Regions:
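Gram-negative outer-membrane beta-barrel transporters
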Residues: 66, 73-78, 91-195
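Transmembrane beta-barrel outer-membrane domains
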Residues: 39, 49-53, 122-126, 162-168, ...
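Hydrophobic, lipid-facing positions within transmembrane beta-strands of outer-membrane proteins
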Residues: 1, 13, 44-46, 54-58, ...
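Residue-level signature of outer-membrane beta-barrel architecture
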Residues: 3-6, 19, 50, 60-64, ...
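Short coil turns and loop connectors of transmembrane beta-barrels in diderm outer membranes
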Residues: 9-10, 54, 65-66, 139-142, ...
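Surface-exposed extracellular loop regions of Gram-negative outer-membrane beta-barrel proteins
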Residues: 5, 9-55, 75-113, 189-199
Length: 224
Protein backbone atom coordinates (compact mmCIF):
# COMPACT_ATOMS: atom_id res chain seq x y z
CA UNK A 1 0.00 0.00 0.00
CA UNK A 2 1.38 3.40 -0.97
CA UNK A 3 -0.06 6.89 -0.61
CA UNK A 4 1.42 9.97 -2.23
CA UNK A 5 0.86 13.70 -1.98
CA UNK A 6 2.32 16.80 -3.58
CA UNK A 7 3.52 19.19 -0.89
CA UNK A 8 4.46 21.93 -3.35
CA UNK A 9 5.33 22.45 -7.00
CA UNK A 10 8.77 20.96 -6.35
CA UNK A 11 8.28 18.47 -3.49
CA UNK A 12 6.16 15.35 -3.21
CA UNK A 13 5.89 12.78 -0.46
CA UNK A 14 4.87 9.12 -0.40
CA UNK A 15 4.20 6.77 2.51
CA UNK A 16 4.30 3.01 2.06
CA UNK A 17 3.47 -0.11 4.01
CA UNK A 18 4.03 -3.74 3.03
CA UNK A 19 3.50 -7.04 4.81
CA UNK A 20 5.83 -9.73 3.45
CA UNK A 21 6.26 -13.44 4.14
CA UNK A 22 9.29 -15.44 3.01
CA UNK A 23 9.74 -19.19 3.20
CA UNK A 24 13.18 -20.53 4.19
CA UNK A 25 15.34 -21.43 1.20
CA UNK A 26 16.54 -24.95 0.49
CA UNK A 27 20.05 -23.97 1.59
CA UNK A 28 18.81 -22.49 4.87
CA UNK A 29 16.87 -25.67 5.58
CA UNK A 30 19.18 -28.44 4.45
CA UNK A 31 22.72 -27.09 3.94
CA UNK A 32 25.28 -29.37 5.56
CA UNK A 33 28.74 -28.80 4.20
CA UNK A 34 31.53 -26.36 3.37
CA UNK A 35 31.05 -22.97 1.77
CA UNK A 36 34.62 -22.21 0.80
CA UNK A 37 33.87 -18.73 -0.54
CA UNK A 38 33.00 -17.57 2.99
CA UNK A 39 35.32 -19.95 4.86
CA UNK A 40 32.48 -21.61 6.73
CA UNK A 41 31.07 -25.05 7.38
CA UNK A 42 27.36 -24.30 7.21
CA UNK A 43 24.56 -26.28 8.83
CA UNK A 44 20.92 -25.75 7.89
CA UNK A 45 17.90 -26.08 10.14
CA UNK A 46 14.85 -28.02 8.84
CA UNK A 47 12.76 -26.56 11.68
CA UNK A 48 12.99 -22.97 10.44
CA UNK A 49 9.69 -21.10 10.19
CA UNK A 50 8.61 -18.52 7.64
CA UNK A 51 9.91 -14.98 7.99
CA UNK A 52 7.21 -12.32 8.23
CA UNK A 53 7.87 -8.61 8.15
CA UNK A 54 6.01 -5.32 8.42
CA UNK A 55 7.76 -2.68 6.34
CA UNK A 56 7.15 1.05 6.64
CA UNK A 57 8.79 3.79 4.56
CA UNK A 58 8.40 7.48 3.86
CA UNK A 59 10.01 9.16 0.85
CA UNK A 60 10.42 12.79 -0.19
CA UNK A 61 11.29 13.77 -3.78
CA UNK A 62 12.47 17.20 -4.87
CA UNK A 63 12.86 18.50 -8.43
CA UNK A 64 13.40 22.11 -9.43
CA UNK A 65 14.97 22.80 -12.78
CA UNK A 66 18.57 21.63 -12.71
CA UNK A 67 18.36 20.47 -9.08
CA UNK A 68 16.95 17.23 -7.71
CA UNK A 69 17.00 15.21 -4.53
CA UNK A 70 15.28 12.51 -2.55
CA UNK A 71 15.29 11.16 0.98
CA UNK A 72 13.83 7.83 2.06
CA UNK A 73 13.46 6.53 5.62
CA UNK A 74 12.35 3.03 6.52
CA UNK A 75 11.66 0.61 9.37
CA UNK A 76 11.33 -3.15 8.84
CA UNK A 77 10.04 -5.23 11.76
CA UNK A 78 10.88 -8.88 11.00
CA UNK A 79 9.56 -11.88 12.91
CA UNK A 80 11.66 -15.07 12.71
CA UNK A 81 14.47 -13.39 10.75
CA UNK A 82 16.77 -16.07 9.30
CA UNK A 83 20.52 -15.53 9.44
CA UNK A 84 23.75 -17.50 9.40
CA UNK A 85 25.29 -17.33 12.89
CA UNK A 86 28.88 -18.33 13.60
CA UNK A 87 29.51 -20.60 16.57
CA UNK A 88 31.38 -18.29 18.95
CA UNK A 89 33.91 -20.76 20.34
CA UNK A 90 34.72 -21.86 16.79
CA UNK A 91 36.56 -18.62 15.99
CA UNK A 92 39.43 -19.63 18.23
CA UNK A 93 41.96 -22.20 17.32
CA UNK A 94 41.62 -22.07 13.54
CA UNK A 95 45.04 -20.52 13.13
CA UNK A 96 48.23 -22.18 14.09
CA UNK A 97 47.21 -25.76 13.33
CA UNK A 98 50.13 -28.01 12.51
CA UNK A 99 50.79 -31.64 11.88
CA UNK A 100 51.51 -32.25 15.57
CA UNK A 101 47.80 -31.83 16.32
CA UNK A 102 47.02 -35.08 14.52
CA UNK A 103 47.97 -38.55 15.69
CA UNK A 104 50.31 -40.36 13.37
CA UNK A 105 48.48 -41.97 10.48
CA UNK A 106 45.22 -40.07 11.07
CA UNK A 107 44.08 -38.10 7.99
CA UNK A 108 43.55 -34.37 8.18
CA UNK A 109 39.98 -33.09 8.36
CA UNK A 110 39.63 -31.05 5.13
CA UNK A 111 37.19 -28.72 6.90
CA UNK A 112 39.18 -28.17 10.11
CA UNK A 113 40.03 -24.54 9.26
CA UNK A 114 36.46 -23.55 8.40
CA UNK A 115 34.31 -21.65 10.89
CA UNK A 116 31.22 -23.62 11.90
CA UNK A 117 28.04 -21.63 11.33
CA UNK A 118 24.36 -22.46 11.79
CA UNK A 119 21.20 -21.07 10.23
CA UNK A 120 19.09 -19.68 13.08
CA UNK A 121 16.19 -17.27 13.39
CA UNK A 122 15.21 -14.53 15.78
CA UNK A 123 13.01 -11.45 15.71
CA UNK A 124 14.88 -8.40 14.38
CA UNK A 125 14.35 -4.78 13.42
CA UNK A 126 16.02 -2.92 10.57
CA UNK A 127 15.94 0.85 10.12
CA UNK A 128 17.84 3.31 8.03
CA UNK A 129 17.73 5.93 5.33
CA UNK A 130 18.93 6.79 1.84
CA UNK A 131 19.47 10.32 0.57
CA UNK A 132 20.71 11.75 -2.71
CA UNK A 133 20.82 15.23 -4.16
CA UNK A 134 22.44 16.64 -7.22
CA UNK A 135 22.42 18.98 -10.16
CA UNK A 136 22.27 18.43 -13.91
CA UNK A 137 23.59 21.21 -16.13
CA UNK A 138 24.47 21.81 -19.76
CA UNK A 139 28.16 21.65 -20.60
CA UNK A 140 29.48 22.07 -24.13
CA UNK A 141 27.09 19.95 -26.24
CA UNK A 142 26.24 17.48 -23.46
CA UNK A 143 24.90 17.23 -19.91
CA UNK A 144 26.95 17.08 -16.71
CA UNK A 145 25.42 15.64 -13.53
CA UNK A 146 26.98 15.98 -10.08
CA UNK A 147 25.46 14.18 -7.10
CA UNK A 148 26.02 13.11 -3.51
CA UNK A 149 24.34 10.19 -1.79
CA UNK A 150 24.45 8.47 1.58
CA UNK A 151 22.87 5.27 2.86
CA UNK A 152 22.70 3.93 6.41
CA UNK A 153 21.24 0.72 7.81
CA UNK A 154 20.96 -0.38 11.45
CA UNK A 155 19.87 -3.87 12.46
CA UNK A 156 19.37 -5.42 15.88
CA UNK A 157 17.83 -8.60 17.19
CA UNK A 158 15.05 -8.43 19.77
CA UNK A 159 17.52 -9.15 22.59
CA UNK A 160 19.62 -6.12 21.63
CA UNK A 161 22.65 -7.66 19.90
CA UNK A 162 23.58 -6.72 16.35
CA UNK A 163 22.51 -8.64 13.27
CA UNK A 164 25.69 -9.98 11.57
CA UNK A 165 26.98 -9.07 8.10
CA UNK A 166 25.32 -5.65 7.86
CA UNK A 167 26.82 -3.20 5.37
CA UNK A 168 28.46 -0.13 6.93
CA UNK A 169 27.27 3.39 6.16
CA UNK A 170 28.69 4.97 3.04
CA UNK A 171 28.86 8.23 1.10
CA UNK A 172 28.80 8.18 -2.70
CA UNK A 173 30.10 11.08 -4.79
CA UNK A 174 29.22 10.84 -8.48
CA UNK A 175 29.94 12.66 -11.72
CA UNK A 176 28.50 11.74 -15.10
CA UNK A 177 28.68 13.35 -18.51
CA UNK A 178 26.48 12.43 -21.46
CA UNK A 179 26.98 13.63 -25.01
CA UNK A 180 25.03 11.99 -27.83
CA UNK A 181 25.84 8.27 -27.65
CA UNK A 182 28.77 8.55 -25.22
CA UNK A 183 28.43 8.41 -21.43
CA UNK A 184 31.26 8.83 -18.93
CA UNK A 185 30.69 8.08 -15.23
CA UNK A 186 32.95 8.57 -12.24
CA UNK A 187 32.00 7.63 -8.68
CA UNK A 188 33.84 7.53 -5.37
CA UNK A 189 32.49 5.46 -2.48
CA UNK A 190 33.62 6.52 0.99
CA UNK A 191 32.67 3.60 3.24
CA UNK A 192 32.65 4.05 7.02
CA UNK A 193 34.20 1.70 9.56
CA UNK A 194 31.69 -0.90 10.76
CA UNK A 195 31.65 -1.03 14.55
CA UNK A 196 28.12 -2.41 14.99
CA UNK A 197 29.23 -6.00 14.56
CA UNK A 198 27.48 -9.27 15.29
CA UNK A 199 28.64 -11.98 17.66
CA UNK A 200 32.02 -13.38 16.66
CA UNK A 201 32.63 -10.72 14.01
CA UNK A 202 35.51 -8.26 13.88
CA UNK A 203 35.24 -4.60 12.91
CA UNK A 204 35.88 -3.71 9.27
CA UNK A 205 38.04 -0.71 8.50
CA UNK A 206 36.86 2.27 6.49
CA UNK A 207 37.89 2.38 2.85
CA UNK A 208 37.45 4.34 -0.37
CA UNK A 209 36.78 2.93 -3.83
CA UNK A 210 36.91 4.81 -7.14
CA UNK A 211 34.99 3.51 -10.16
CA UNK A 212 35.02 4.83 -13.73
CA UNK A 213 33.02 3.78 -16.76
CA UNK A 214 32.93 4.91 -20.37
CA UNK A 215 30.21 3.61 -22.68
CA UNK A 216 29.27 4.21 -26.30
CA UNK A 217 26.03 3.10 -27.91
CA UNK A 218 26.04 1.82 -31.50
CA UNK A 219 22.99 1.62 -33.77
CA UNK A 220 23.19 -1.68 -35.64
CA UNK A 221 19.91 -1.17 -37.51
CA UNK A 222 21.51 1.11 -40.07
CA UNK A 223 18.81 3.72 -39.55
CA UNK A 224 19.90 7.30 -39.09
Amino acid sequence: VSLGRELSDTVNMSIGYASVERLPSVIELFMNGPHNATGRLETGNPNLKSETSDNFDITFNYENGEYYGYASFYVNDVDNYITLMDEEDDHDGHDGHDDDDHPAGEPHDPHENLIHADYVQEDAEFDGYEIEFGRTMSLASGELTLSFGRDVVNAKFADGHNVPRINPSRNVYSLSYKQDDIVFKLSMKDVDKQNDIGEGETATEAYQMLDTRLTKTFDLSGKS
